[in-house]
């Protein structure tokens, strides 16, 4: 048969393959957060994970440029949302800013701005600025460049970057 050293190497390789196979089976694949609801995780790049939203953004959106003062975000269906954040208007991303107009919705102007982005061809990010005096009214902007550059802003802006598409 084979020399004992070769048999040990073959055995070692088989053990490594088994360990990797079990690890791969343990990782649950997903398309949306609801696929991960049984253990409280979120879907990031097709895998259920418990990493922070900010770490997920860095993994999911390659080449994103985040201002160091941005320390958190929130998972929402279809988007990562950032409070008090805007686009860096000097960046190529910021230069694609499209002013949709002032929006007002009785249920949620932020959600309305997000839904308008979903309907706009090429929109990969939205921004809602609640600078108006009337509650729930503000300006809605869209972005189409796939290399986001975000910076900290005043307390009236909310920004959303699309998940799992860039």
Swiss-Prot record:
GO-annotated cellular components: host cell plasma membrane; membrane; virion membrane
Cellular localization per UniProt: Virion membrane; Host cell membrane
TM regions (residue ranges): 5-25
Topological region Intravirion: 1-4
Membrane topology note: Single-pass membrane protein
Residues on Virion surface side: 26-166
Induction: Early structural protein.
Record InterPro entries: Pan_app
Main location: virion
Alphabetical list of Gene3D superfamilies matching this protein: Hepatocyte Growth Factor (3.50.4.10)
Keyword field: Early protein, Host cell membrane, Host membrane, Membrane, Transmembrane, Transmembrane helix, Virion
Annotated family: Belongs to the asfivirus envelope protein p22 family.
Protein name as it appears in the record: Putative membrane protein 164
Taxonomic classification: Viruses, Varidnaviria, Bamfordvirae, Nucleocytoviricota, Pokkesviricetes
């Amino acid at each position: 048969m084979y020399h004992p050293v070769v048999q040990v190497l073959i055995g070692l390789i088989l053990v490594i393959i088994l360990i990797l196979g079990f690890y791969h089976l343990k990782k649950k694949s997903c398309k949306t957060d609801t696929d991960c609801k049984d253990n409280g995780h979120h879907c990031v790049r097709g895998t259920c994970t418990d990493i922070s939203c900010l770490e997920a953004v860095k993994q999911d959106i390659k080449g994103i440029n985040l201002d160091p003062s941005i320390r958190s975000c929130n998972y929402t269906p279809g988007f990562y949302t950032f409070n008090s954040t805007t686009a860096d208007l000097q960046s190529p991303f910021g230069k694609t800013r499209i002013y949709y107009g002032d929006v007002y919705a009785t249920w949620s102007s932020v959600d309305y701005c997000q839904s308008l982005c979903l309907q706009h061809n090429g929109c990969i990010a939205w921004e809602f600025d609640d600078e108006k005096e009337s509650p729930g009214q503000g300006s809605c902007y869209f972005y189409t460049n796939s290399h986001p550059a975000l910076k900290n802003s005043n307390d009236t802006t909310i920004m959303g970057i699309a998940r799992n598409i860039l």
